[in-house]
Amino acid sequence: MNKSILTFAFLASSASLISMGAAAETTISGNISSKCSVFTDTVGVYGNPSPDELSTLVADGGIQPIIRYDVSIADYYTAKISWPNSFTTSPNLTDALNWDGEIEVHNTSDAGMSGYEAAKVEYENVTEYDLSVAGSTWFKVTSEVTYGVDKSLPGGEYKASVEALCIAN
């Protein structure tokens, strides 16, 4: 009889566990490394070819910034580069600034990238390139700014930033 009671008690507790059910929450995680990296290869410097102008062109005494994109998988990324349209640092300026600029392919690691320049998309101060070939591409940036109408820029430090993004398609 004790054996029957023990067996019944065991079966009842097992049935109770089965009817209650069990639940678990399992986490799935992962880390993704970007297959597109952006680097500054050459820092830009403004030349001052005339009292009212700053320019990164070599002919104007400047140094054009060079931005490098390294892409390990083709057709998944877009380079989005903006030439400056404001100063991040400057003396107090009381007149209008007129900005102009250009982004161009400077060098490539693969001959298949030769069509990048012809296929670029430009709007406002932004240039986009479809990075359709794996490898490295160097872009040079031209930045020019004039101050007022025949008005001299005040002495002091001037800085502007190029924004270079790698956008996943």
Give residue spans per PLM region.
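N-terminal small/polar-rich segments of proteins
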Residues: 22-96, 128-169
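Extended, solvent-exposed segments with strong compositional bias
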Residues: 112-134
